[in-house]
Amino acid sequence: MGDNGDGGEKKELKENVKKGKELGRQAIGEGYINPSLQLARRLISLGVNVTFATTVLAGRRMKNKTHQTATTPGLSFATFSDGFDDETLKPNGDLTHYFSELRRCGSESLTHLITSAANEGRPITFVIYSLLLSWAADIASTYDIPSALFFAQPATVLALYFYYFHGYGDTICSKLQDPSSYIELPGLPLLTSQDMPSFFSPSGPHAFILPPMREQAEFLGRQSQPKVLVNTFDALEADALRAIDKLKMLAIGPLIPSALLGGNDSSDASFCGDLFQVSSEDYIEWLNSKPDSSVVYISVGSICVLSDEQEDELVHALLNSGHTFLWVKRSKENNEGVKQETDEEKLKKLEEQGKMVSWCRQVEVLKHPALGCFLTHCGWNSTIESLVSGLPVVAFPQQIDQATNAKLIEDVWKTGVRVKANTEGIVEREEIRRCLDLVMGSRDGQKEEIERNAKKWKELARQAIGEGGSSDSNLKTFLWEIDLEI
């Protein structure tokens, strides 16, 4: 067949794409959006123009996008469809179908974004994509655009994912049935079934993540030592960062607002993509009225909502302990269409002892001197923010990677204590109180060790991200290696 002209146009487009200094970022969930925005900010400070791409729905929900982030020189925004722009997919919906639609619609949108940018004279020259979006790298490669994965969880978890899909899956699955059995993997601490990511069990409630995760791991395995940017720092996970020879993991974290690192850039605290409306900011005034190190901060993240039974145990633990608390208590109506009520008597007692809010700006809370500890679900953003804040932790993991993060908190970094659930998976009130009393009570050997370690990691984190620190150097080296000027 004769050349119909398409080949020439494609070649010309590839040439257009290769010229320039534009870097595309793709992220979808808030757990990735906030560190991704911080990564964008760091890249911009090094002279790189960034196009930040996320789903239509996430972009619509990014409340702060309209002020600081929208006026940042060097940063532009784009959205792509995941097939559910009208919010028709519920949290308990068919997520296998969602991932399929995300790939189909997202691929079309990214193709349009790349071609439009090239035709407008601002070509994308590198793509950084988030976990489970490996199709973005496939699309980029058709235009000869190189790419790298941004992993917003710890290097230990990335190594676990890679091992699971590259020769160790059967071994891990066989030991998941025995809580007393240890799982030994190169470069990682000894782990038990209680420390494993929740989707590793093929029969578990999060098994729907296995297929897209397998696709991601196999995609990385087919490449020649691909670069992976990881939201951690060298001193925190030295062994895990070197555990997988087939991957070149580069620690570039902690990717958090400068306010937690001792910076004074007020706009940076709002350089995030809040997907939930903040009801008010009177919680800061409330914290101002409390003594130093006297408040327990409680948050289980943007996705998890405690069951009725578990929430009741937490309520009783708080009331019985007497500790003052600030609790980010989201309504169940956000997740299940059923609003949970706390009976009036308990609610009155809770309001006398502490404060409950539907949402807050966590960065502002964590840097407040009134905080004494952080009861957290151990999502990675919250975990690394606790480390940078120097706060002792009560680890209350719920799902996905959180049990692994809790293991690291308690046994590796030793900055907190982890709650132990009963055989039904419920953490009872006595156990919650035991952990709270340990980190908030009178000083003893374990409490003092936790406080010492919290201060140590706080300093090491700030050193890593500072000028000339390991993470600062790693990011500059990355840009030099991909031939983007700094």
Curated annotation (Swiss-Prot):
* Pfam families in UniProt: UDPGT
Looking at its record, which EC class is this enzyme? transferase
User: Which residues bind UDP-alpha-D-glucose per the record?
Assistant: S302, C360, Q362, W380, N381, S382, E385, D401, Q402
User: What's the Enzyme Commission number for this chain?
Assistant: 2.4.1.350, 2.4.1.-
Q: In which pathway does it act?
A: Secondary metabolite biosynthesis; terpenoid biosynthesis
What reactions does this protein catalyze?
Answer: mogrol + UDP-alpha-D-glucose = mogroside IE + UDP + H(+); mogroside I-A1 + UDP-alpha-D-glucose = mogroside IIE + UDP + H(+); mogroside II-A1 + UDP-alpha-D-glucose = mogroside IIIX + UDP + H(+); mogroside II-A + UDP-alpha-D-glucose = mogroside III + UDP + H(+)
Q: Which SUPFAM superfamilies match?
A: UDP-Glycosyltransferase/glycogen phosphorylase (SSF53756)
Where in the body, by tissue, does this protein show up?
Highly expressed in young fruits 15 days after anthesis (15-DAA).
Judging by the UniProt lineage, the source's domain of life is Eukaryota
Alphabetically, the GO molecular function entries are: quercetin 3-O-glucosyltransferase activity; quercetin 7-O-glucosyltransferase activity
Is Ubl conjugation set as a keyword in this record? no
Q: Mind listing the UniProt keywords for this protein, alphabetically? A: Transferase
Cross-referenced CDD domains: GT1_Gtf-like (cd03784)
- Family that this chain belongs to: Belongs to the UDP-glycosyltransferase family.
Please name the PANTHER family in this protein's record: GLUCOSYL/GLUCURONOSYL TRANSFERASES (PTHR11926), UDP-GLYCOSYLTRANSFERASE 75B1 (PTHR11926:SF870)
Miscellaneous notes for this chain? Answer: Mogrosides, the major active constituents of S.grosvenorii fruits, are a mixture of cucurbitane-type triterpenoid glycosides that have been proven to be powerful and zero-caloric sweeteners and can hence be used as a sucrose substitute for diabetic and obese patients.
What function does this protein fulfil? UDP-glycosyltransferase involved in the biosynthesis of cucurbitacin and mogroside tetracyclic triterpene natural products (e.g. siamenoside I and mogrosides IV, V and VI). Cucurbitacins have cytotoxic properties and exhibit deterrent taste as a defense barrier against herbivores. Mogrosides are nonsugar highly oxygenated compounds used as high-intensity zero-calorie sweeteners; they also possess pharmacological properties such as regulating immunity, lowering blood sugar and lipid levels, protecting the liver, and acting as antioxidants and antitumor agents.
- Would you tell me the protein name for this molecule? Mogroside I-E synthase
